Amino acid sequence: MALKGQEDYIYLFKDSTHPVDFLDAFRTFYLDGLFTDITLQCPSGIIFHCHRAVLAACSNYFKAMFTADMKEKFKNKIKLSGIHHDILEGLVNYAYTSQIEITKRNVQSLLEAADLLQFLSVKKACERFLVRHLDIDNCIGMHSFAEFHVCPELEKESRRILCSKFKEVWQQEEFLEISLEKFLFILSRKNLSVWKEEAIIEPVIKWTAHDVENRIECLYNLLSYINIDIDPVYLKTALGLQRSCLLTENKIRSLIYNALNPMHKEISQRSTATMYIIGGYYWHPLSEVHIWDPLTNVWIQGAEIPDYTRESYGVTCLGPNIYVTGGYRTDNIEALDTVWIYNSESDEWTEGLPMLNARYYHCAVTLGGCVYALGGYRKGAPAEEAEFYDPLKEKWIPIANMIKGVGNATACVLHDVIYVIGGHCGYRGSCTYDKVQSYNSDINEWSLITSSPHPEYGLCSVPFENKLYLVGGQTTITECYDPEQNEWREIAPMMERRMECGAVIMNGCIYVTGGYSYSKGTYLQSIEKYDPDLNKWEIVGNLPSAMRSHGCVCVYNV
C-alpha cells in the first residue's frame, strides 16, 4: 500500500562492498571449478579452468577472441604458446583478485605476456617497476625492450639515463653488445651528454675493438655520423693497410687521431640539460620557479610553489620530477612533513605523501629510483632519523639512523653511496660536525669514512668524474675528495663566499648559484662556473634575483 504524498520519494541504495564481494565470489567459483566455461593451456601442458566473462572483462585480447568471428570463440580449450605457466597463473589470479606480484625475476616475462594478452593495467605496472629500477647498467637493454613493447614512459626514462650518463653507460658490458643501428641511434641524439672530443670518440673505439673483424667496416660510418672532421682518404687507406693486422684499441685510436684534420673544430656544445631554481630566501621565503639554459643564457619562469610560506626545505630531482620536502614556516619555525612534487614536463605541482618525520635544513638526494630525506632539524635540534620514498609503492620507508644527526649539512650520491658532509650537530646545533658519513643502501648501514679538512655548514656538494666536490660556505675554499684514494685536495678557490648556495653539474662543469656572503653582508645573485680542465672559476650569469637556501637541480632534456 503506497504512502500518501511520497510517490516520488526515491532511495538509491549502493552497496560499497558489492564489487569486492562480487570478485570474491568469482574467485571462489574459480578455485572450486564452478561455472567455468573455458580452459587455458600453457606449452608445458598445465591448464587453468576459467570464466570467459572474467577474462574478457580484464583483457581485450580475450574479449576479441570470445566475441569476434574467430575459431577460438567456439572452442572450450585455448592453447597459449610462449607463456610460462607461472606467468599465466599470475595473470589469471590477477583477473580474479586484482593483485599480482611483480619481481625483478618475473617482470620482463610478465610484461611480455601482459602486452600479448592485453592486460593493460598489469603491463603499466610492470613498466613502472622497470622505470623504478633503471640504472646505467641496464638502460640500453631497457630502451630496446621499451621500444619493442611500446612502453612510452620506460622508453623516455631509459633514454634520459642513456643520454645524461653516456660516459658511464658506454663503459658497461651491455654497451659492447649493441647493434650498429642502436649505436647510431644513440649517437644521433641531440641531447647526448658529451662535451669533449674524446668523450664521443672513445666509445666508438671501444665498441669497434670488441668485435673488430665484423665492426671495423662500420668505423668510418660511425665517425661520419658524429660529424668528426676526419680525412676520409687517409682513414680508408690506413684501414686497408691494417686489414691483415690485429687492430687493438690503441691502434684504432691512433688511426682515428691521425686522421683528424689539423684544423678540425671541437664538437659543438649541445643543450643537454636545464637548471631549475626552486624557491629560496631573500629576506622572506621565495616561491618562484626559474628555469635556465646555460648555452642560451635564457631564463623562463615556471609555476610557483603552492605552499609559498615555507623555507629551508630539501630539494632533489628524480627523472622529470622535482621533490620539495619538509621545511618550516617563518611564523612558528615548526618542522613540516609535507612534500610537493613539480613535474618539469607539465609545469604542474602536486602534493606528495607526507614524510614519516617532519624536518627542515635536511639533506635530500635520489638513489636507486627513490627519494631520500636525511637528518635535519626537528624541535630545534639535529635529528638522526633518515627515510626514503619509493614512488612505485607510494610510501616512505625508514632506514638506519645516521651516526650523527646533522642539520644544514650537504649530501650527494656517488657510485650508489650517499655521502653526508658537515653540518650542525649537538644540542640545538651548537657544534659543527667534521666527519663525512656514508650510507650503503644494500646493507642499510652508515659509516664514518673521513674528516672534512674545513668543517662547515651551509655547503654544497656535487659528484663529478668519480670524485666529490665541496663548494660554498663561509670561505672561498673548494675541495675535491677521492673516495677510492681517501684523499682530499684543494682546487682553485671560488670568486665569492657563498653560504647556502646551490650547485649542479652541467655540460662537464660545476655551476654554483646565489648564496649569502657574510663578508659582504649581502645575498648573491651571480652564477659561478668551474671548469675542471682549466681549474678555473668564472662568473657566467645571474639569477633572476639574489637568494640563498634555494633548490638547484639539473633536469636532462629528452
UniProtKB/Swiss-Prot annotation:
Q: InterPro entries of this UniProt entry?
A: BACK, BTB-kelch_protein, BTB/POZ_dom, BTB_POZ_KLHL23, Kelch-typ_b-propeller, Kelch_1, KLHL23_BACK, SKP1/BTB/POZ_sf
Which residues lie in coiled coils?
none
* Positions annotated as Kelch repeat: 274-320, 321-369, 370-416, 418-466, 467-508, 510-557
Native source organism of the sequence? Homo sapiens
Task: Give the transmembrane ranges.
Answer: none
- Could you identify this protein by its name? Kelch-like protein 23
Q: Which keywords label this protein?
A: Kelch repeat, Repeat
User: Which stretches make up the BACK domain?
Assistant: 139-240
Any one Gene Ontology MF annotation carried by this entry is: ubiquitin-like ligase-substrate adaptor activity
**Gene behind this chain?**
KLHL23
The keyword Repeat is assigned to this record: yes
What Gene3D superfamilies is this protein classified in? 1.25.40.420, Kelch-type beta propeller (2.120.10.80), Potassium Channel Kv1.1, Chain A (3.30.710.10)
Tell me which Gene Ontology terms the entry assigns under biological process.
proteasome-mediated ubiquitin-dependent protein catabolic process
PANTHER family cross-referenced by the UniProt entry: KELCH PROTEIN, RING FINGER DOMAIN AND KELCH REPEAT-CONTAINING PROTEIN DDB_G0271372
Q: What's an example GO cellular component term for this entry?
A: Cul3-RING ubiquitin ligase complex
Where does the record place the BTB domain? Answer: 36-104
Q: Which cysteines are joined by disulfide bonds?
A: none
Q: Name any one Pfam family assigned in the record.
A: BACK
